[in-house]
Amino acid sequence: MENQEKVEQAVYQLLEALGENPEREGLLDTPKRVAKMYAEMFSGLNEDPKDQFTAVFSEVHDEVVLVKDIPFYSMCEHHLVPFYGMAHVAYLPSGDKVTGLSKLARAVEVAARRPQLQERLTDQVATALEEALNPRGVFVMVEAEHMCMTMRGIKKPGSKTITTVAKGIYKEDREERKEILSLMRDF
């Protein structure tokens, strides 16, 4: 985190502005706890999702690689409240280059740990994978519930937002796209 002390001061001032007493027993360590939490939740600001693809292997595989149901949480940059859900990340290797499966989950994790929009999160994961491996195709789907729609405003708990990014063959070929969507939904 850039400046933990500054975050602590901001939380202290926020509590005061809300009419709370930051010196009372229950709130005494809250600024420090919140700053520590934000350091963890926003740790992706100092990392690039593309850099997670450190394990690249020479392996001939010309069929889809899909990691489904990758749980994540992030913070809506508009309200600084959580959104969370599942990411599904697929790629079609272009010859003899594959990556470790955990690297797909790590890219999701890094992209999610920052003030974020779901649309951007989806694109950042897809772009990182495309740039790291240069596969024939990439397809990323993110399903999430946004607390900004659950706790405030319209108050619609349980509603989910789905975003997708298709690159390469999954953008160009309708049949390939249908196949990957079927795999993501059916299993």
Curated annotation (Swiss-Prot):
It catalyses: GTP + H2O = 7,8-dihydroneopterin 3'-triphosphate + formate + H(+). It comes from the Bacteria. One of its GO terms (biological process) is one-carbon metabolic process. GO terms for molecular function: GTP binding; GTP cyclohydrolase I activity; zinc ion binding. Pathway: Cofactor biosynthesis; 7,8-dihydroneopterin triphosphate biosynthesis; 7,8-dihydroneopterin triphosphate from GTP: step 1/1. Coiled coil: none annotated. GO terms for cellular component: cytoplasm. InterPro entries: GTP-CH-I_C/QueF, GTP-CH-I_N, GTP_CycHdrlase_I, GTP_CycHdrlase_I_CS, GTP_CycHdrlase_I_dom. Zn(2+) binds at C76, H79, C148. Keywords: GTP-binding, Hydrolase, Metal-binding, Nucleotide-binding, One-carbon metabolism, Zinc. Its EC number is 3.5.4.16. Signal peptide: none annotated. NCBIfam families: folE (TIGR00063), PRK09347.1-2 (NF006825), PRK09347.1-3 (NF006826). Toroid-shaped homodecamer, composed of two pentamers of five dimers. Belongs to the GTP cyclohydrolase I family. PANTHER family: GTP CYCLOHYDROLASE 1, GTP CYCLOHYDROLASE I. This is GTP cyclohydrolase 1. It comes from Streptococcus thermophilus (strain ATCC BAA-250 / LMG 18311).
